[in-house]
Amino acid sequence: MDPDNAAKYFSNAKSARDNVDSLVSEVNSILDPMRDKKFVVFHDAYQYFERAFGISASGAISLGDASDPSPARIAEIRKRVVDEAVECVLAEPQFNQGTVKAVIEGTKANTTVIDPLGVKLEPGPSLYENLIRNLATNLAKCF
């Protein structure tokens, strides 16, 4: 297709692969101390992240992002937080923080905001890396 630029394409691909490998190593180091700890996410949007880095949420407050969780759902997750000694419940900036407060009230669980949209991140070539790094860093801070 474009043999004149083949060397540049291969170089760019190698650089991107090296950056991803480095990011994976960094994120694994960030997450290592909390691998066996229990956490709950606001909504079930992190399955690929969890699978890629060998972690697993104990549950999600909301089963989707289109509507607020019902009182029954909040009670169910709250019971799970208590029964499983969940240490962290993740909030998201675009959702009602009061819901997370209702889930953790009276428990020993901590909470922190995790931003899967990267709203406050600077657009540019490092956006994806920064987004993944921030997810890991903010999750680890919760413990």
Question: What annotation goes with each model-predicted range?
Answer:
Residues 1-143:
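Extracytoplasmic metal-acquisition and chelation regions
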